[in-house]
């Protein structure tokens, strides 16, 4: 394979920039920049870099990783330079004379091709890079440690063990007894049950990776946009005394106790003849159905006249808020018609911590086990595992052993696609195309 190079750190002014070179000719970097110092593997070496005119480009730290003991499994040279745009540009220009610029995710792709990481670990790398909260990072790190790979490889090996027994029975049909068939059926049912339990996870891993959606719902002028802006810590939604100001769905990302929360502002729900407002209300109701959790807003002045359409939205995913509670001193829940409301006044900054704590408790009750157990984190993984289950479900022991064996092979292949034992160009493009250049 050709030798590639790229800037690994973000482009722009910084204290330090890191430029990575990987490939069989990576050590030519030393000769090209006229590095006279003896560079030893895994030792940081301070040295000047020279251009063709023997002018100093920069004084850098060089780190050399010899194959196969590197991230990519190839010879790797890292140049730790000053983060000057001019210096970075000059070094990249020099490297471009002898090497090929790396594409997005190409270093990680080479790590995969050289058996340094499987596909689940490769996906975890990009998830860690994109993580914005502690829980997202923890999930990615756990996956990078191989928790998913070990789980899928375990199921794969169990299927291979069953397949081996099947092949033996095909070669020695006289050994096939009703007990042997029952034992194989029992083992396959156990594997299938484990796979189905893994699939029936409420998509918790994917939700944690993408963000937990919390929709703010209520009548017009119930303080939804005011609360939304307060949680976002900036003015995103237009706040007005006129009812029906919010028409479209707005989103902002916040961090609550390390969990990635996407707060959604919606149009006020009421009867309206305005077609534009009607569309906003329709979208609000859709968000009420699809959101992971809901904040139901009721203005304090309307506590004695509950809107049935709003009350009907309340379920076990809901947190009820009595908004505009400026005159209420208590921090305790207020019970109205057997519904507990958190009194909140945004303008007086009252009840906000109570609300955030309530959101945290709801989220932790649903997602805390994500911090200890390996969960599916991508649609790609889910599709292949579901395919494996479907194949196992369709196995009939009334068919010849040869056909059952073929179905088992297909199921094994689906699990192999998850970790990348079997891969094709489309799968690799889908996984590694999400990476930035330099990773």
Swiss-Prot record:
Binds 1 potassium ion per subunit. GO terms for cellular component: cytoplasm. Its cofactor is K(+). Mg(2+) binds at residues 225, 246. It is found in: Cytoplasm. GO terms for biological process: tRNA methylation; tRNA wobble uridine modification. Its EC number is 3.6.-.-. Belongs to the TRAFAC class TrmE-Era-EngA-EngB-Septin-like GTPase superfamily. TrmE GTPase family. NCBIfam families: mnmE_trmE_thdF, PRK05291.1-3, small_GTP. Exhibits a very high intrinsic GTPase hydrolysis rate. Involved in the addition of a carboxymethylaminomethyl (cmnm) group at the wobble position (U34) of certain tRNAs, forming tRNA-cmnm(5)s(2)U34. Homodimer. Heterotetramer of two MnmE and two MnmG subunits. This is tRNA modification GTPase MnmE. It comes from Ehrlichia ruminantium (strain Gardel). The gene is mnmE.
């Amino acid at each position: 394979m050709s030798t590639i190079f790229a800037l690994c750190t973000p482009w722009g002014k910084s204290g330090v920039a890191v430029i990575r070179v990987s490939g069989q000719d990576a050590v030519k970097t030393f000769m090209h920049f006229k590095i006279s110092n003896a560079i030893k593997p895994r030792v940081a070496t301070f040295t000047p870099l020279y251009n063709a005119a023997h002018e100093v480009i920069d004084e850098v730290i060089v780190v050399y990783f010899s194959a196969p003991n590197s991230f990519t499994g190839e010879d790797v040279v890292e140049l730790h330079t000053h983060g000057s745009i001019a210096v970075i540009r000059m070094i990249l220009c020099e490297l471009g004379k002898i090497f090929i610029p790396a594409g997005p995710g190409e270093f990680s792709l080479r790590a995969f091709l050289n058996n340094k990481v499987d596909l689940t670990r490769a996906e975890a790398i990009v998830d860690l890079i994109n993580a914005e909260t502690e829980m997202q990072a923890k999930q990615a790190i756990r996956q990078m440690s191989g928790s998913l790979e070990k789980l899928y490889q375990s199921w794969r090996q169990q299927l291979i063990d069953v397949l081996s027994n099947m092949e033996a029975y095909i070669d020695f049909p006289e050994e096939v007894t009703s007990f042997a068939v029952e034992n194989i059926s029992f083992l396959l049912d156990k594997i299938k049950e484990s796979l189905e339990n893994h699939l029936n996870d409420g998509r918790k891993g994917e939700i944690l990776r993408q963000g937990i959606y919390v929709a703010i719902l209520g009548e017009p002028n119930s303080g939804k946009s005011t609360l939304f802006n307060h949680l976002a810590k900036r003015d995103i939604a237009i706040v007005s005394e006129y009812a029906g100001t919010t028409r479209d769905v707005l989103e902002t990302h916040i961090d609550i106790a390390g969990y990635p929360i996407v707060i959604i502002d919606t149009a006020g729900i009421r009867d309206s003849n305005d077609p534009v407002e009607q569309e906003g209300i329709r979208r609000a109701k859709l968000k009420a159905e699809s959101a992971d959790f809901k904040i139901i807003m009721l203005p304090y002045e309307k506590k004695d006249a509950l809107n049935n359409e709003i009350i009907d939205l309340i379920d076990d995913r809901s947190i009820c808020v009595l908004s505009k509670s400026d005159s209420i001193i208590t921090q305790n829940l207020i019970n109205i018609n057997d519904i507990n409301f958190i009194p909140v006044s945004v303008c007086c900054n009252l009840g906000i911590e109570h609300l955030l704590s309530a959101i945290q408790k709801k989220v932790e009750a649903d997602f805390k086990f994500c911090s200890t157990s390996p969960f599916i984190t991508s649609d790609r993984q889910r599709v292949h595992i579901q395919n494996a289950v479907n194949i196992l479900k369709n196995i009939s022991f009334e068919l010849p052993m040869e056909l059952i064996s073929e179905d088992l092979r297909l199921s094994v292949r689906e699990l192999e696609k998850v970790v990348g034992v079997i891969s094709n160009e489309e799968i690799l493009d889908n996984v590694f195309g999400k990476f930035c250049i330099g990773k």
